[in-house]
């Protein structure tokens, strides 16, 4: 039993070693996608079209947008004044930019 548990823990450690760099790369790519496609309206987490609905954590929470799924849907399909990017960006691009937005909102858009 101890041998199986030890093997399982070792496998988990190896797996996690590969997951963390992939997530960092996804955030870096998400930042590039954001800069190229979103920053004109959302630079620094702001919203030039509707200043009341920013990408700040409190606003994302208030409007039910503080999840990968919600942001992915919004970016893919658009809503209101925000255009749809589903035909312009790949699913990976959209997932990466959604992760980037959530990460930045947690950091207060400080970097």
From Swiss-Prot:
Post-translational modification: Binds 1 heme c group covalently per subunit.
Coiled-coil stretches noted in the UniProt entry, renumbered to this chain: none
GO BP annotations listed: photosynthesis
Highest taxon, organism lineage: Bacteria
Binding of heme c, residues: 38, 41-42, 82
Keyword Iron-sulfur among UniProt keywords: no
Subcellular location field: Cellular thylakoid lumen
Main location: other
Sample GO molecular function, one term: electron transfer activity
Record Pfam families: Cytochrome_CBB3 (PF13442)
GO CC annotation terms, alphabetical: plasma membrane-derived thylakoid lumen
Keywords: Electron transport, Heme, Iron, Metal-binding, Photosynthesis, Signal, Thylakoid, Transport
Signal peptide positions (record): 1-24
Keyword Heme: yes
PANTHER family per UniProt: CYTOCHROME C6, CHLOROPLASTIC (PTHR34688:SF2)
Assembly behavior: Monomer.
Family membership noted in the UniProt record: Belongs to the cytochrome c family. PetJ subfamily.
Role of this protein: Functions as an electron carrier between membrane-bound cytochrome b6-f and photosystem I in oxygenic photosynthesis.
Name of protein: Cytochrome c6
Organism: Synechococcus elongatus (strain ATCC 33912 / PCC 7942 / FACHB-805)
High-level lineage: Bacteria, Bacillati, Cyanobacteriota, Cyanophyceae, Synechococcales
